[in-house]
Amino acid sequence: MFFGILKAIILGIVEGITEFLPISSTGHLIIVDQFVKISSNKAFTTTFEYVIQLGAIIAVVLLYWKRLWPFGGGKTEKQRFNIWATWVKVVVGVIPSVIIGFLLNDWMDKHLMNWLVVSIALIVYGIAFIFIENYQKNRRPRVRTINHLTLADVLKIGFFQVLSIVPGTSRSGATILGGISIGVSREAAAEFSFFLSIPTMLGVSVLKIGSYLHSHGMFSGEQIVILLVGMFVSFVVAYVVIKWLLRFIQTHDFKAFGWYRIILGVLVIALGAIGIID
């Protein structure tokens, strides 16, 4: 039990750090999992990875509660309207990934969940971040806040999110890159990426958990403890990381993350080539 909890803490930290940074949580977990296996049961390991995502989602909801909850006192009609408008944009933004994900998710997991695909995605999107940031360097953002996003804008960002079905792409990376490439400010692109994560990650996590319970029955007591520990650690770390990222991008661009992705991608290739990861 002790070592199971320790592994859950380590993986929760990795998930909390990488989920909302554009560096691919999958790319990191595929490496860490080789050294810190939460379980010999592959189905439980996969389910654990989706459960700890719930902790990261809770961090977003808690941080942005006032901007996401339209009910209760103290809000003007304009504020309520903006909140409902934000939710409409989120729903429109997730439509492409819901459709494509439903059609291709199982095929992607079967054929693309390997270190080579992950490493290529890390490198390709790392280069894309550097290119887009250089291209947009001297351009003023066309959209500075989520309130100014049009439905056409969010649909385009939603199609970028579809790219994250490929392992190693990074859901946050794809949506932030998509936002910046169409002229959205870094802050607005990052925040909308956080908001899109709520229905996207919640839906996938619930489906994966339901699938596990249907196939394997209820979790054991030890498994429940491990899941809760991992989810709580992911929540705490993600909360801190989101606040840090929002401060960071006020004075920095995303090129550093692009270079980091390239280095990580090369590392994954090296580890895969010598057989350390499979």
UniProtKB/Swiss-Prot annotation:
Subcellular location per the Swiss-Prot or TrEMBL entry: Cell membrane
Transmembrane segments: 1-21, 43-63, 83-103, 112-132, 192-212, 224-244, 257-277
One GO MF term attached to the UniProt entry: undecaprenyl-diphosphatase activity
GO biological process terms on file: cell wall organization; peptidoglycan biosynthetic process; regulation of cell shape; response to antibiotic
Coiled coil: none
Root EC class: hydrolase
Function: Catalyzes the dephosphorylation of undecaprenyl diphosphate (UPP). Confers resistance to bacitracin.
Protein name stated in the entry: Undecaprenyl-diphosphatase 1
